[in-house]
Amino acid sequence: MAILEEKAAVIPPGGMAVAGRLDRSVRSRLGEICAGRGASLLVLGEDLSLLEDPREPVFDLYTPWSLYTNLRLTVLGHYQRGNAAVAIGAAEAFVGGPLDRAQVRSALLAVRVPGRLEVISDRPLCILDGAHNPAGMAEMVRSLDYLLDRRRVLGVVSILRDKGALEMLNSLSPRCDILFVTQNSNPRSYPADELANLAEGLENKPKVFLDADPRSALRSAYKLATSNQVVLVTGSLYLVADIKRSLESHPRP
C-alpha cells in the first residue's frame, strides 16, 4: 500500500488517474484518494476492457471514448496488453477523446521494451526478463506458459534482498530444471550463497547450482541447455543490465 500512496501523490486535484488491474484493497484506497481530490479514475477491467484470447496475436480494447480493434504488440508477454490498454486510456484522458485508430495500431507495433521477455539468442533460446518482485515474477511465469508451452527452463537468477525472494523463487521453480543462482552488481543483491540456501529449501526445488558471477552462470546454462530447454535470466533488472553489459563486447557468454 505504501507504493500506492507514493504513486498516487502525483494525481492532481480535479485530474484523472488511469490504473491497471488492482486487487480489492488497493482499488478501494485509490478510489478514496481520487474522491478526496475530486479526480476521476479509470481502471482496467472496469472502464477499460480487453477482448482477447491470450493465445491469439491480436486483441481489441474498449474505452469510454472508443473501440480499438485488431491491435497487435510485437513485444512478448501477455501482461503487456494490459500495459498498452492503460497507456491508451491515459492518452485518451490527456487529449479528452478518442485517438486515431491507425496511429494507435502503428504505435503499438513500434513498441520495444528491453529486458522484458527479451530474446537475445535462439541457439539456445535465451530470454532476459527483469521481473523483480513477486507479482512481476508470477505474471512473467504465466506468460512463459503461453509462450513456451511445455519447454523447460534453465534459470539464471539473482534477486534483491527487499523484493520477496522466497515468493519469487516459489513462482519460478516449478518451470525450471535447474536454477543457476548468482549475484548482481547492486549492493542490495542477495549474496549468491544465501539465495542458493533459500532455493535449496523450496518444497519442489529443481537442481540448484551456485555461481556468484552472472556471466559464468549464464555460460554454464548455455552449455547444459538442450534443444527443448530455454535459458531464462530473471529476478532483477540489475542482473539483466549486468548480463547485457557483459555481452556487448563478447556476444556469446
Language-model region placement:
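Acidic, Mg2+-coordinating active-site environments of NTP-dependent enzymes
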Residues: 1-70, 84, 88-102
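Nucleotide phosphate-binding/pyrophosphate-handling subdomain across enzymes
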Residues: 2, 64-178
